[in-house]
């Protein structure tokens, strides 16, 4: 397992060997006798997997699996599992944290208040930056899987118009699906 995995909790199931960050060349050597590999961003392709003759399982502490040669694993009977939806809401929420920070100047207003400028102001509500609302604005979402659809739901709560592009055909209430170029 890599250093992002709680090895102490896994040791009840068998011998656990934990490594820090490895170079690509070190990975093949380290997993040669492994039955199972649990990792996050470690690249596991034919070059790093071909010596792992006992390998039966790769577990990913990640939503994506683009770092794994899925076809090689399929041909060699290696099961691959990811954590497909573990961060869906956190990522959608963070998307709006960034939108609100950028669009509403949250950091600048927080500094304005912390520096005492709000209190010293001669007006009731000193607006250093324009007040912007998300209502009525349009958001474009590329990819409408679990994260994209969660972002759309939050956008709808802000009364935004939602446009989305997805490679495969999808439908969702209140979402207009358009081509990538149109988006």
Residues covered by each model-derived region:
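Rossmann-fold NAD(P)-binding glycine/threonine-rich loop
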Residues: 66-78
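An anion/phosphate-binding loop that grips the pyrophosphate of nucleotide cofactors and donors
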Residues: 34, 52-55
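N-terminal glycine-/charge-rich "phosphate-binding" loop or analogous flexible N-terminal tail
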Residues: 1-34
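Short beta->alpha connector loops at strand-helix junctions that form conserved
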Residues: 20, 40, 61-62, 78-89, ...
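Phosphate-binding beta-alpha-beta segment of Rossmann-like dinucleotide-binding domains, i.e.
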Residues: 76, 84-138
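Rossmann-like dinucleotide/phosphate-binding beta-alpha-beta segment
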Residues: 12, 125-183
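Structural alpha-helical scaffold elements that stabilize or flank donor/cofactor-binding regions
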Residues: 10, 29-30, 48-51, 182-183
């Amino acid at each position: 397992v890599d250093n992002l995995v709680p090895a102490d909790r896994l040791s009840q199931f068998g011998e656990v060997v934990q490594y820090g960050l490895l170079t690509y060349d070190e990975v093949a050597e380290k997993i040669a006798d492994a039955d199972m590999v649990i990792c996050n961003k470690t690249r596991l392709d034919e070059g790093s997997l071909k010596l792992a003759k006992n390998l039966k399982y790769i577990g990913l502490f990640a939503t994506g699996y683009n770092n794994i040669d899925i076809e090689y694993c399929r041909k060699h009977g290696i099961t691959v599992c990811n954590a497909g939806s573990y961060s869906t809401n956190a990522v959608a929420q963070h998307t709006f944290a960034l939108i609100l920070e950028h669009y509403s100047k949250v950091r600048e207003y927080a500094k304005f208040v912390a520096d005492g400028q709000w209190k010293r102001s001669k007006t009731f509500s000193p607006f250093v930056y324009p007040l912007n609302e998300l209502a009525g604005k349009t958001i474009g979402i590329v990819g409408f899987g679990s994260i994209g659809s969660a972002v759309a739901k939050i956008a709808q709560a802000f009364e935004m118009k939602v446009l989305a592009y997805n490679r495969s055909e999808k439908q969702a209430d209140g979402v207009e699906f358009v081509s990538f170029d149109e988006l």
